[in-house]
């Protein structure tokens, strides 16, 4: 059995196996649909209103992207014969799909974000990215590609704004915030610091702070950012002002922020809902 993975956003979620063909679409009431893909699943990114993008390995192509709605009905299919597509996302308005592509240029690998309108196979924009892409999502109407060197915010016309890590190493990120992204960087600015920051789509820091305690997980949703430290859970706003603190979190290993200000804490054997 391969590695199980989950992508969740806006009250919907997808559970799947990397390298497998089956996925399970969920909403707040439970299972919506069990789906079998035509190829091996590389990645799935859930977006707004239940729309999600699936990157597949298909015979005859390097990779393919399929887009579905919240009922599991197909909206769009794209097949790439020239470039490998690593991950993809659907725009917040449901009109565009962006796929992170990798190709070779002079012996080295380069990454780009290819944007398509869901009514056409014609390439709308091809934006060069800094670094290799780890994750994709949307923030405040823009696509966001999380790379090993920067956060790259890309508009539908291909315009790119970048937040550089300044030599820091990406530890964790959160893209669920409505108007911000969150990053945790280690060895920031060669000072050995752990740096927590919220960032807008212009690539500018909204707020930041130095972190001394170990961070187990972080998650953003709506106006809030949840950071699970080894000794406490802190819920911040986009300005990194503390909204609430929960001290007893010794059994928790993961956190899922919710847009209403509550958070789900998950451990090895149980999960609980924190209501500030």
Positions of PLM-derived features:
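Non-cytosolic head/periplasmic domains of membrane-anchored proteins
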Residues: 1-100
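A short beta-strand motif characteristic of beta-propeller blades
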Residues: 1-2, 29-36, 73-79, 120-128, ...
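Repeated scaffold domains used in trafficking and secretory/extracellular systems
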Residues: 2-11, 39-50, 82-92, 128-142, ...
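Residue position within the beta-strands of beta-propeller blades
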Residues: 15, 54-55, 98-100, 145, ...
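Short proline/glycine-enriched turn/loop motifs at strand-loop junctions of beta-rich domains
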Residues: 18-20, 148, 213, 230, ...
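Solenoidal tandem-repeat scaffolds enriched in leucines and small polar residues
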Residues: 61-152
